[in-house]
């Protein structure tokens, strides 16, 4: 499931995309280790742990800009693919979830990854102090908005699903 993103091209970046608690932060380090390339961690999580989760739109723009800066720095080093634990597209979806609108900065942003891995919500939601959308309907809406953002942007993406090693196998089946 998904569009584009087949083999044959050198990918500069692979982005882990999707709502809260689907295993992105578990897969990210493992995928970076598999390729021997950098991992850009979830900038929004670091921001939330430092500043709290009572976000204004300006906070989300700051998160997106911070993540974009770290990504550009990693890409400039030339070790590919850089693994991104989310990016500004995901922060745009957060804006949609929290406020029902987004700052124009998000739609103007042009730094999309070469491949997006959309993580299914087939794992249990786990509270960690920064997560907000644990109810089934909220998780489904978050997933649907995440998928819609990828489709709206027309970027290559693939669905990642499965429990335990099956999830890793799903990732490896797409990324090699």
Predicted regions and their residues:
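Short, Lys/Arg-enriched N-terminal segments with co-localized hydrophobic residues
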Residues: 1-8
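Pre-Walker A (Motif I) flank of P-loop NTPase domains
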Residues: 10-13
């Amino acid at each position: 499931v998904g569009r584009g993103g087949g083999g044959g091209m050198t990918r500069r970046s692979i982005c882990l995309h999707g709502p809260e608690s689907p295993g992105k932060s578990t897969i990210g380090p493992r995928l970076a280790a598999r390729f021997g390339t950098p991992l850009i961690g979830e900038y929004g999580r670091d921001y939330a742990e430092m500043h709290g989760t009572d976000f204004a739109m300006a906070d989300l723009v700051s998160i997106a800009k911070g993540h974009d800066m770290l990504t550009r720095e990693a890409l400039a080093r030339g070790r590919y693919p850089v693994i991104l634990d989310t990016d500004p597209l995901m922060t745009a979806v957060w804006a949609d979830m929290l406020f029902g609108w987004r700052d124009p900065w998000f739609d103007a942003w042009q730094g999309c990854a070469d491949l997006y891995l959309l993580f299914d919500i087939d794992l249990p939601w786990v509270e960690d102090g920064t997560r907000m959308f644990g109810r089934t309907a909220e998780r489904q809406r978050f997933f649907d908005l995440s998928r819609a953002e990828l489709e709206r942007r027309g970027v290559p993406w693939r669905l990642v699903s499965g429990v335990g090693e099956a999830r890793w196998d799903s990732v490896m089946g797409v990324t090699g």
